[in-house]
Amino acid sequence: RLIKQSNKNNNIKIKKPFTITLDPGHGGLDPGAVRYSYREKDITLLAAKELKGLLEKKGYKVFLTRNKDEFISLRKKKNIAKKNSSDLFISIHVDSVKKKSTRGTSIYTLSDKASDKVTAMLAERENKVDLIAGIDKEVDNEVFSILLDLQRRDTKNASASFAEIYVNKVRNNGYRALRRPHRQAGFAVLKSPDIPSVLVELGFLSNPKDAKYLSNKKSRARVLKALSEAIFDYVKTRSKI
């Protein structure tokens, strides 16, 4: 898949492969959610590699923030996406809550105000992962400027656009989603000013059915199909701009 890109010197439109950075959530000393002998960091890595394969078959250029079981800081993840001139950043996760009956996928985009308390708690939990590795949380003035003036407003709009496309694809594929599948909060990993970024929760390890479903490659392919189709449709909308 190719997209048009302006050459600053002569304003000629040139084509480059649409580039995606996939971020398998957690890793290394940070296992993420752990339930029923399943670990979030293992499922997200498998899912990211499988999705990478689907996308590369369609001609997309795909990078992973990690290819093995290792810890990557939130800041480094964003830098990897920027270094590779990514057109889209997707952080892949699996959720876990006290209520075992809760199940289904959801997608999150950046906002300075959380859409609900549960999402605010999720963002707070995900934003603390660097502390596990002893990495101090930095005071980042850039982040505040992003949230205050929404630098590159198109980035926020593009992220929301992808989220809505994903929700529709999930429903069309008959995959279970939360009642309000698109939510917003201040996820640190999504704070790139010029790269549309989303965080996708594939399901809930705290739910026995979801846990079994996501730990199996064949059944996991269903939600990855919806995610890959969302990417295909999103690229089509961006190529028209």
Language-model features, listed with the residues they occupy:
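Active-site-adjacent mobile loop/cap segments within catalytic or ligand-binding domains
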Residues: 21, 148-241
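Catalytic-core regions of hydrolytic enzymes
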Residues: 2-143, 152-164, 172, 225
